[in-house]
């Protein structure tokens, strides 16, 4: 496949050597529907992975992601503001901690604008994670379209990674940021 669903994610380098990833998507669904898909564990399992989320600031967050759901992510809910904002720490095996954030806005047409970001990502992980989140948001859109996303998405991740490599000029090295940010 030589196509990509949705706009490419962007990234910005921080002074501490990490990067911030950002994606913007529009879903033709009410904000409450999108909110439930990103916050209710039984709905998260459809597109992201099996997990749990305690619906409150300070609550526990855990999800198993990746092909075969082999990667166990843990964290804490930092922001809980239904149905417009959710932020959680996202701790990888080995202790690398980032922050993911979903900001939702209802549009006048009854759709939902979703801005997703991940901050504090080590730059050496970006070439896998940037296309990875693109894939997960693509899977979220498939769920809204009534399509069951494929269980093994390794091949699709590889396709998207190549497309991101073409867009940002690399396939294996750290990409050049689209902008710089400071803390």
Which ranges hold each PLM region?
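Terminal "cap-and-tail" regions of soluble proteins that handle hydrophobic small molecules
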Residues: 1-15, 110-113, 118-183
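Hydrophobic ligand-binding cavity/cleft-lining segments
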Residues: 1-52, 176-183
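Short, solvent-exposed helix-to-loop capping segments enriched in aromatics
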Residues: 37-45, 60-69
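Short, hydrophobic secondary-structure boundary micro-motifs
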Residues: 46, 56, 151-153
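Hydrophobic-ligand binding "helix-grip"
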Residues: 49-56, 64-122
């Amino acid at each position: 496949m030589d196509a990509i669903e949705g706009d490419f994610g962007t990234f910005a380098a921080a002074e501490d050597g990490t990067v911030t990833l950002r994606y913007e998507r529009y879903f033709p669904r009410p904000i409450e529907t999108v909110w439930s898909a990103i916050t209710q564990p039984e709905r998260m399992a459809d597109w992201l992975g099996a997990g749990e989320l305690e619906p409150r600031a300070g609550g526990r967050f855990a999800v198993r992601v990746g092909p075969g759901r082999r990667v166990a992510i843990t964290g804490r809910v930092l922001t809980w503001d239904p149905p417009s904002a959710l932020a959680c720490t996202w701790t990888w095996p080995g202790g690398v901690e980032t922050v993911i954030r979903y900001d939702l806005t209802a549009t006048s047409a009854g759709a939902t604008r979703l801005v997703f970001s991940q901050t504090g990502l080590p730059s050496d992980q970006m070439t896998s994670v940037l296309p990875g989140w693109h894939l997960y948001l693509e899977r979220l859109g498939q769920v809204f379209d009534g399509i069951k996303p494929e269980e093994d998405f390794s091949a699709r991740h590889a396709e998207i990674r190549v497309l991101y490599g073409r867009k940002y000029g690399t396939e294996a090295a750290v990409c050049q940021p689209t902008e710089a940010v400071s803390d």
